[in-house]
Amino acid sequence: EFVFVIGASGSGKSTLIKMLYREEKPDKGSIIIGGINVAKLKNRKVYVLRRKLGVVFQDFKLLPKLTVYENVAFAMEVLGYDKKEIRKRVLEVLDLVGLKNKVRQYPDQLSGGEQQRVVIARAIVNKPKLLICDEPTGNLDPDTSMEIMKVLEQINAMGTTIIMATHDRDIVDRMKKRVVILDHGRLARDIEKGGYYNERA
């Protein structure tokens, strides 16, 4: 499934995203991801949840002294994969996001759109079932934003659920995916194939 989370500033989008990957804990209620109740997860077990997730932020959070390849490989190295498996998978995901020819470059040698592709590659290299995106096109121009959305659609088509918080009306209106509208921390609407303006209907 591909779900957009929209709403005015202060509606709770970022808080919801942070709760999904347990940056914040909900005051009440449950959040179930892959059979894990995130709300009741002990701090020492948060890593178990995060291994099942990929997260893409608006600000790229790339390691500046590592190459494109090394930035993506790092996500597998910390989990103890062997070098042969890492190389195979990293090259696969860099090919998927259109960066196979940029493996030796550093983040400051890339455009904003290319840096975001590296972030996406790093987020999916461990084959997460859920990819959480917090304003992934917020720092990009409209054309580059649509290129990033095509990459996310490809990933979604391969079986990964995507939850994306955004303010970008054009993207939401064009893509006609499920739209969840938040208002002051509450669910205002849930539309199967919606647009940014559906809440006015």
Summary of predicted features, one role per range:
Residues 21:
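Helix-to-loop junction immediately C-terminal to a conserved catalytic motif
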Residues 105-110, 114-116:
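Conserved ABC ATPase signature
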Residues 125-129:
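A short, proline-enriched helix->beta-strand linker immediately N-terminal to the Walker B motif
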Residues 142-144:
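Helix N-cap at the start of a conserved alpha-helix in ABC-type nucleotide-binding domains
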